[in-house]
């Protein structure tokens, strides 16, 4: 029987271990990047939803030519924003699925800083009370700025988060 003519088929154990090590290292780095990206997406979406809510309140104020207030209600870990005709009409509790309220959707986005508990939008000339609200998580910190003329915009405070520019 001839045994010297055999061709090798398959991979050696050492080759398999090297390939598995390389794949594990690349997957670990990719997983870390993916988690950071998800955190940035959650922060950006929460800030955009808050901006949309405040824009609706501002548009409603301008449409009816009335002053509207938005009250910020921090309740421990939870927080929400409640819209009303004035500060006394705003509810004191956060409820899910209420059209006049903005409730945060993710647990990891926290309210970092704010200038006042009450933000006012004036129907006359579409003006507003100036202020800002900062939201943060492990991906960074975003600031929603409200100017006296009623302009609202988002900016990143310390580092660029996705496509939102620095303040």
Can you name each region flagged by the protein language model?
Residues 9, 14-18, 39:
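Internal alpha-helical transmembrane segments of multi-pass membrane proteins, especially GPCRs
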